[in-house]
Amino acid sequence: MKKVIIVGGGISGLTAGIVLQNSGFETHIYEKNPIGGGELTGWKRDGIYIDNCIDWLTNSKADDSEMYALWKDIGMLGEDIMMCSKDKFFSYTADGKTVTFWRDLERTRKEMLEISPEDEENIEKFINTVKIGEVFTVPANKPMDKFGLKELKKFMPFLKGMGAIRKAYAGMSLQDLADSFKSPVIGKAFTMMHPANTQAFSFIVSYATITSGSGDIPVGGSLAAALRICDRYKEVGGTLHTNCPVKKIVIAGKAASGVLLEDGTEVNADYVIAATDANHCFTKLLPAEYMPKKMKAVFDDKEHYSTFSKFHAIYLIDGKVGIPEDTSFWKCDGPMIGRTKMNACGTLCYDYDPETYPAEDKTLIQVKVIQYLEDCLEWIDLASKDKAAYDARRQEYADRLMAEIVKRYPEAEGKIRLIDTWTPATYASRCNSYNGAYMSFVADKDSKTVTTPGVIKQLKNVFLAGQWNMGSGGLPPAAVQGKFAAWRICKKEGVPCK
């Protein structure tokens, strides 16, 4: 039985481990944190559950898609796991008008036309393109660079659909899309969920996931999902070593002999999968020159590929004060959060999940504010050099956001309290995340998203897994990249990938 060491117990590492165990390998995952899951996680403060990750889960619909099958295989989803059904993507209110991106696409069309009949042509184009995007799915059985005619034929509707969307909004960012509308309320709504420099294509595909009914949330949230996946890995015979960081991958000629742990222990293996942040992999685990050329080109091209993260704050309110469940934004003349001047504020209200919100007479909300590179680096630097100043800034920003919530919902005055905050420095510390980013690169409107095969040409038995291998990242790319690393090992050994 061949032995595989997996560095990193996030969604990629766990997926690779489950697939390899099912395919007849012995696997060991080495994870630096007390539990597996990586950014798929949550925690408790004052007895209140705080969710870090899932706002919607692509390919969550129980169908015959490859991605749904993978979600089932690893324990993310299943017939016995209840789902929170999203009735909207989000809403935005300004100047007495509300734009809602409903799950019911026709309702969205109708309401947008009522707000701005003069935008009819633009609205119809947007709605019809979202309909096309409902074919979106994530190929999950084998890497796309290994597709043959059979796979190309199977995914032709998907490939044609994505091509049609890219053609319809070629060379357009979300800001460009927003500016194309005569209605400032409709236009501004498009820039609420994603950074304004994101390709319009990405927003359309994200929204289409909701309208297709394939973007719901498993009850219990991210931590429950992570623990299910960890349990599945152990059930199939895998060994998860927690609180066990890896110092480097040990190289012997054109192969790796294993890994060296931070405590000085050397562990040998036939294969190694680096299921970590890509920058961490090629600055700590392996020499920088081993980074694949396609990946390095993206890291080097800072003009067209950027990273971002967010400042997060969680609040608990005694009672119900009119905050709608799920995600809603409103126009405000808000404070500075880092270098971001808030002209809109939003809440994610967890009333939709009976297992995570605290009580029927309470309201739990999260506020997120985008932080771009300079702010992210400043958070990381401050956290490492002056913990007291870092904590003070977190509190200051949380107080500013609380004031905006009370302005919008006056009944919350005297009833709202801060539960917790976290920042780009949290992701950098916990997950070794590049620039504190919780997702991969944002490709601008003049660029293409890049998928890097998880192969290191100089090393015959080391493979890469993780969201940084695939487009803008996220949970589905992280999972499938773990599956693909396992697939490549199975292929080399001549065994079926299960």
What does each of the following model-derived ranges do?
Residues 239-240, 244-257, 421-433:
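Beta-rich nucleic-acid/ligand-interaction surfaces
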Residues 251, 491-498:
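Active-site-proximal substrate-binding core of FAD-dependent oxidoreductases
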Residues 217-218, 247-360:
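Mid-domain catalytic core of redox enzymes
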Residues 467-490:
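A conserved FAD-binding loop/helix module that cradles the flavin
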Residues 131-236, 243, 430-445:
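Active-site/ligand-binding neighborhood in enzyme catalytic cores
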Residues 318-422:
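C-terminal segments that line or cap access tunnels to active or ligand-binding sites in enzymes
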Residues 184-197, 410-471:
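A glycine-rich dinucleotide-binding beta-alpha-beta segment and adjacent secondary-structure elements
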Residues 2-135:
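N-terminal glycine-rich phosphate/pyrophosphate-binding loop and immediately adjacent elements
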